[in-house]
């Protein structure tokens, strides 16, 4: 069965050029005459395009910094199968993967993608359901980082964890719930690990948290209850990287 198409848009020249440079298949480019210098490139790539007025862009993409260039693409092409990710990491002595358990905010998802690229994570795993998809906001917030990473969308996180544990990965869940007695994140020394972060409100699924090899927290001033998920992820990943 074919996957249903998930379409998204790229806005602006820089995002469009990054997509072209990464051989991303673009279905359609909506463009204004101010970008006429790009038309030979678009034609050479055999991409369908339509020329529109400034008013058209402002009406269609209100409140978005469209820059009068909007490229439409199928986001499924940005994903790789789990088996392909396994081949990438199975023979590595050290590797870090990030797993997202039902992230809902597209700005968080986009920021997470940027952080993972900057910290040289080997792959990002997220759910097909109850998870914000790679939409326009995610694409824009990721600042092009979506094109340079191993992105895996799965139906079942627990099954995925089992597959990765078979090739030497350990699971590390980020949680502030004292019932799990999380340790300082700086004490983790697994060579191959999956950092699992959860939903902005509920955190990581209880069963996944219970079965984790390690549960961690970021020690904080007691006047602060929690950190944004993308901020917390960045603190942990860069500490591990360095």
Swiss-Prot record:
The species this protein was found in: Mycoplasma genitalium (strain ATCC 33530 / DSM 19775 / NCTC 10195 / G37) (Mycoplasmoides genitalium)
Domain of life: Bacteria
Binding site for S-adenosyl-L-methionine: 198, 218, 227
Protein name: Uncharacterized tRNA/rRNA methyltransferase MG252
Phylogenetic placement of the source organism: Bacteria, Bacillati, Mycoplasmatota, Mycoplasmoidales, Mycoplasmoidaceae
GO biological process, alphabetically ordered: methylation; RNA processing
Entry's EC annotation: 2.1.1.-
Keywords: Methyltransferase, Transferase
Family membership: Belongs to the class IV-like SAM-binding methyltransferase superfamily. RNA methyltransferase TrmH family.
Disulphide bridges: none
Listed SUPFAM superfamilies: alpha/beta knot
Pfam families referenced in this protein's UniProt entry, alphabetically: SpoU_methylase, SpoU_sub_bind
One GO CC annotation: cytoplasm
InterPro entries: Alpha/beta_knot_MTases, rRNA_MeTrfase_TrmH, SpoU_MeTrfase, SpoU_subst-bd, tRNA_m1G_MTases_N
One annotated GO molecular function: RNA methyltransferase activity
